[in-house]
UniProtKB/Swiss-Prot annotation:
<comment type="similarity">
    <text>Belongs to the bacterial histone-like protein family.</text>
</comment>
<protein>
    <recommendedName>
        <fullName>DNA-binding protein HU</fullName>
    </recommendedName>
</protein>
<dbReference type="InterPro" id="IPR010992">
    <property type="entry name" value="IHF-like_DNA-bd_dom_sf"/>
</dbReference>
<comment type="function">
    <text>Histone-like DNA-binding protein which is capable of wrapping DNA to stabilize it, and thus to prevent its denaturation under extreme environmental conditions.</text>
</comment>
<dbReference type="GO" id="GO:0003677">
    <property type="term" value="F:DNA binding"/>
</dbReference>
<keyword id="KW-0226">DNA condensation</keyword>
<dbReference type="Pfam" id="PF00216">
    <property type="entry name" value="Bac_DNA_binding"/>
</dbReference>
<dbReference type="InterPro" id="IPR000119">
    <property type="entry name" value="Hist_DNA-bd"/>
</dbReference>
<comment type="subunit">
    <text>Homodimer.</text>
</comment>
<dbReference type="GO" id="GO:0005829">
    <property type="term" value="C:cytosol"/>
</dbReference>
<dbReference type="GO" id="GO:0030261">
    <property type="term" value="P:chromosome condensation"/>
</dbReference>
<keyword id="KW-0238">DNA-binding</keyword>
<dbReference type="GO" id="GO:0030527">
    <property type="term" value="F:structural constituent of chromatin"/>
</dbReference>
Amino acid sequence: MTKADFISLVAQTAGLTKKDATTATDAVISTITDVLAKGDSISFIGFGTFSTQERAAREARVPSTGKTIKVPATRVAKFKVGKNLKEAVAKASGKKKK
C-alpha cells in the first residue's frame, strides 16, 4: 500500500476529505519523527511502541568485493508490535497465537 492509498483509506474510514486525511497523516508522521529524533519513545497501547536504539560499531563485509569495512555506531528507529495488532495480524493470516 502506498501513502496515497493509505490516505484514501483513512479519508474513507474517518469520513474526511482527502485533504484533511493528508494533513492528519502528515502530522502523525512528522510528530513520530520528531519524537524519535529527540531520542524519546511513543506508545500506542495495543498497537505498538516506536523507539530508538543505539547500534554498536561493527565490521561488515561487502558481498561483491569481499572487502571488510567499518560501520560506525548509530542510533536506529525500531517498532515493537503491541498485543492487539499482533493478534489481529495473526487472526487475519489464519495462524494461531503461540
